[in-house]
């Protein structure tokens, strides 16, 4: 983990922990019989990725095979020799890490002493996995889409893409229910939500419908604030991601080809993730 991730995580967790304990409630009936109130919440979400296997192909040409860079790549991005000497990992597919640090969400909602509804915005990012840590100089982030015969030992006529991470920004409308327990400060809750995700895959952002579920328990600190812990499940509907820009056209001679130019590619990837959530309500 680098220093940037540590700083961002520490800062946002601190903000969640020290939200001011002031009331944002609006009583809508008599003061001795309040029915509903507005609330805000913030939470930290360590998340596990549960993505399918990614497949990627060019839009305008028939992709015969996908090659990854060799594991001991020296970091020189423009090869002086044949391309098939560096793109040697046949049938390469990007995989993603879990997200233990950079998952956060905030919500504004309306609670009715049991039922509640909220609008939630969340942010999560999943880095590309370096399998076994064996790939040097970020070689695991690159692949070549080869249009030549797939029987060759390396990429010959191809374009290249670079994949650093997958980012998922969710805009969700959740319907929730808090189970009130008489005389106890704890309240189990359950939520179901639908919305839209802005999913960035290989630097191309595609809007997608999505749905999620949440289950947890909250603990009332005082009438104006609660803390909660729970689990969540989130799934993106639709697995095709378009408008992925390709770059750096290579041929077997190692030079850019005037006949084959960069264009766009599409990827197929099932996006699903789950994890825990820890946060705070302020009423």
Language-model features: locations:
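Glycine- and aromatic-enriched membrane insertion/assembly motifs of diderm outer-membrane
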Residues: 59-149
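Outer-membrane beta-barrel "beta-signal"
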Residues: 46, 266-283
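Cleavable N-terminal export/targeting peptides
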Residues: 1-36, 283
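Outer-membrane beta-barrel translocator domains and adjoining extracellular loop/strand segments
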Residues: 52-59, 130-136, 200-209, 240-246
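Transmembrane beta-strands of outer-membrane beta-barrel proteins
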Residues: 41-45, 120-122, 191-193, 230-232
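Residues that define the transmembrane beta-barrel architecture of outer-membrane proteins
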Residues: 36, 100-104, 167-171, 205-211, ...
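Gram-negative (and chloroplast) outer-membrane scaffold detector with strong preference
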Residues: 107-201, 279-283
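Outer-envelope beta-barrel architecture signal
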Residues: 32-40, 113-117, 184-188, 223-227, ...
């Amino acid at each position: 983990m680098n220093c940037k991730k540590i700083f961002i995580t520490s800062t946002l967790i601190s903000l969640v922990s020290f939200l001011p304990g002031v009331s944002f409630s609006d009583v809508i009936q008599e003061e001795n019989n309040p029915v509903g109130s507005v609330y805000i919440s913030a939470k930290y979400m360590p998340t596990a990725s549960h993505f399918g296997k990614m497949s990627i192909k060019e839009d305008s040409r028939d992709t015969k095979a996908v090659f990854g860079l060799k594991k001991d790549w020296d970091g020189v991005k423009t090869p002086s020799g044949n391309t098939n000497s560096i793109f040697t990992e046949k049938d390469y597919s990007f995989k993603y890490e879990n997200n233990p640090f950079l998952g956060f969400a905030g919500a504004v909602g309306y609670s009715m002493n049991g039922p509640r509804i909220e609008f939630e915005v969340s942010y999560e990012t999943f880095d590309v996995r370096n399998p076994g840590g064996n790939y040097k100089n970020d070689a695991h982030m690159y692949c070549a889409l080869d249009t030549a015969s797939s029987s060759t030992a390396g990429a010959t006529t191809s374009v290249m893409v670079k994949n650093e991470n997958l980012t998922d920004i969710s805009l969700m409308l959740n319907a929730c229910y808090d189970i009130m327990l008489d005389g106890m400060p704890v309240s189990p809750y359950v939520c179901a939500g639908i919305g839209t995700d802005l999913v960035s895959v290989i630097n191309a952002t595609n809007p997608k419908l999505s749905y999620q579920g949440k289950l947890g328990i909250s603990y009332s600190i005082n009438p104006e604030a609660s803390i909660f812990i729970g689990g969540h499940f989130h799934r993106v509907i639709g697995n095709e991601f378009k408008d992925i820009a390709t770059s750096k056209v290579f041929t077997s001679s190692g030079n850019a080809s005037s006949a084959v130019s960069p264009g766009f590619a599409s990827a197929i990837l099932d996006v699903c993730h789950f994890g825990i959530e820890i946060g705070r309500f302020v009423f």
